Structures are given as structure tokens and as C-alpha cells.
Amino acid sequence: MSDVLDLACDLISRPSMTPDDAGCQEMIAKRLERAGFICEHLRYAAVSNLWATHGRGAPVLVLLGHTDVVPPGPVEAWTSDPFMPDMRNGILYGRGAADMKGSVAAFVIAAERFLAAYPQHPGTLAILLTSDEEGQAIDGVRKVAETLRQRGQGIDWCLTGEPSSSKRLGDLLRVGRRGSLSATLHVKGVQGHVAYPHQARNPIHLALPAFAALTARHWDDGYESFPSTSLQISNIHAGTGANNVIPGALEVAFNLRYNPHWIAPRLESEIVALLDQHGLDYTLHWHRSGEPFYTPEGKLRRIAREVLERFSGAPPEESTGGGTSDARFIAPLGAQCIEVGPVNASIHQVDEHVCLSDLEALPDLYQLLIERLLAEH
């Protein structure tokens, strides 16, 4: 069994459902320390974070990942135990195989190989791992980034190992992500009998015109390589369950995925102004998950393109699509951020998996990126 496969299987066998790290980072830290890294455990609330560095000064390259996984769901739906790595027909199955214990294992192997070849490399190689990427993302990289900012720690480049590839390893290079803004809207009405609507105020009826305006609004025409901003209503709750009672309150949850044309406070102001036009008695609670980020053309993107083309056989698509990632907390520190990882077709699903050939190639891919950025600096 190869080094990367052995380490990936060890990680998968640890049931680190967010925010539980299940000992993954402790095991990785011991291994990195043997390679010469200085490791610091940063624990906030129930979340484990590992900050490991080798070298000193600029440029600083951070390999960013997470050791937590989403719950497997019904275990009986899996072909094999989700926390017992299983290899079948050239594929490794297990929760976290693709998202993202395979990448974390590849980071470690790539770092070990790089340091063996370049023990006195220029700059700083850092690895940042959290157990709070799949959960609330409050006490993970968000909190670590605050700590690094307070210390004055600069970061030049950040490589996130999220499963970004579409159909084959290296066919997509993530160069940015949209921002995410969530809201919970509470609309007050007056409960009553459906036969006597004049004695009640139906919050659903009152809010419908506002919802229509929100969902029909054209927010923008996109921004550079970003798609246009989107608002989606995700949950609506009202009523007692009885079909003869007008509800007294309505709760609606919605989310915006927005491009750099916007910042969260401006979006919030626009939505409040729209709601106020409809005379609703409401309260609104916001949750800012992260602002958008974008890595412009430069050394990082150029090198990443060249490396990915070497591994995939064709130039990668450069994309800002998908959901959010922890890179959104590193970008505000001034870092240029990209995401490169395995195929994402099975992430969060039953029988999550990664092709063994892709897993075996990942350390070489990451090592080449590290060498091109640090050793050739």
C-alpha cells in the first residue's frame, strides 16, 4: 500500500463527524513534526485546528484543508461501512475519501517529499487544518484567520484541497467563490378562522408580493468570471397544521450567493428597503457566511494552469462556481487563493469515493505546485 493510500485509509477510519476531529490532527501533527514542521494546536470551543509551518519569511504558501466530514446518513444504505475504507475495482470508498481526507493525506505526503528534496527552501510552507468546515464554520478557519491577522502573519498564496475537479483530476481550477448571505424573516400577522378573514391578518398573503419582488429581481449581470447574483428561498413555515386556521406568523429562510459586485451590508440594505415598501410587520436576522473572493491573473494562476494541464492533458477550466469554502476566510488576509482537488461527483453522498489513480497522483500534483511556487521563487 502506498504512503498516500495508507494515510488516507487511516484518516477515513476515524469517524470525524463535524466538529469532532477524532484524533486526525494529532496523528498528522506528529508526522509533520518528524518532517521538521513546527505545529500549533488551536482549539476553540469544540473545534480542533492545526497550524503547521516550515521555513520562515515570505513568500508564504498555505495548504488549507479540513479533517471533519458530514454524517454518513443511514449506514445500511452504504455498500460498505463508511468508516471502514474499502477498495473495489480501483476505487477507494469511505466517508471523506473525496471530501477531503484524500487531499489532506496528499498534502502531508507532498510536504514530506518537498522537504526531503528542499530542506532549506525559500519562504514558508504552512498547513492549516480544521474540524469545522462542514459545520458552522465559526470556530475553525474563521477564528484561526482572526488569530493570524492579530499576529501580523502574512499569506501570499493559499491552495485549498477541496474536491474541485469535475470529470477527471485537474480539469477545473477554482479561482474564486461567490459570497454567501443567509436570512431568516419573521412576518407577524393575526391568527384567526379561515371563514372570518376580516378578523385576521394572514402573514402569508401579506408577504407574497414581497417574495415575488425579491425572487423576480435581477440583481446584476455577473462580474468578470462570476455568474449573476442569485436569491433562493429555502424554507417556509407557517400555520398550526389545521386547514381552517389563518396563521399568526410566518417564517421564511432565504440565501443569496453573490459576486464581487456586492458586499453583504449593501445587499442587506437593498432587501430591507424592498420589504419596507410592502408595509410588513417583520423582523429579519442575517448570517454572513463570507464575502466573495477572486484571484486575478498572475503567478499563482499561471503555475496552477501549467501543472493541471500536465496532469489532466488539457488546460483546466477556470471557475468561480460552486458553494463556499474556507478559502473565504484566508483571502481577506491578502492571500491569492485557488482550489485544486479530486473529482467531486460523490461528495456528501452514500458510497463516497475517489479513484485510486487520482489519489496516487495528488501528492505529485501538490508537490509540483509547491516546488514551482517556493523552490523556484
From Swiss-Prot:
Pfam families: M20_dimer, Peptidase_M20. Keywords: Amino-acid biosynthesis, Cobalt, Diaminopimelate biosynthesis, Hydrolase, Lysine biosynthesis, Metal-binding, Zinc. Its EC number is 3.5.1.18. Signal peptide: none annotated. It comes from the Bacteria. GO terms for molecular function: acetylornithine deacetylase activity; cobalt ion binding; succinyl-diaminopimelate desuccinylase activity; zinc ion binding. Zn(2+) 2 binds at residues 99, 134, 348. Its cofactor is Zn(2+); Co(2+). Pathway: Amino-acid biosynthesis; L-lysine biosynthesis via DAP pathway; LL-2,6-diaminopimelate from (S)-tetrahydrodipicolinate (succinylase route): step 3/3. GO terms for biological process: diaminopimelate biosynthetic process; L-arginine biosynthetic process; lysine biosynthetic process via diaminopimelate. Binds 2 Zn(2+) or Co(2+) ions per subunit. Zn(2+) 1 binds at residues 66, 99, 162. Transmembrane segments: none annotated. It is an enzyme of class 3 (hydrolase). Gene3D superfamilies: Zn peptidases. Catalyzes the hydrolysis of N-succinyl-L,L-diaminopimelic acid (SDAP), forming succinate and LL-2,6-diaminopimelate (DAP), an intermediate involved in the bacterial biosynthesis of lysine and meso-diaminopimelic acid, an essential component of bacterial cell walls. Belongs to the peptidase M20A family. DapE subfamily. PANTHER family: ACETYLORNITHINE DEACETYLASE, N-ACETYL-L-CITRULLINE DEACETYLASE. This is Succinyl-diaminopimelate desuccinylase.
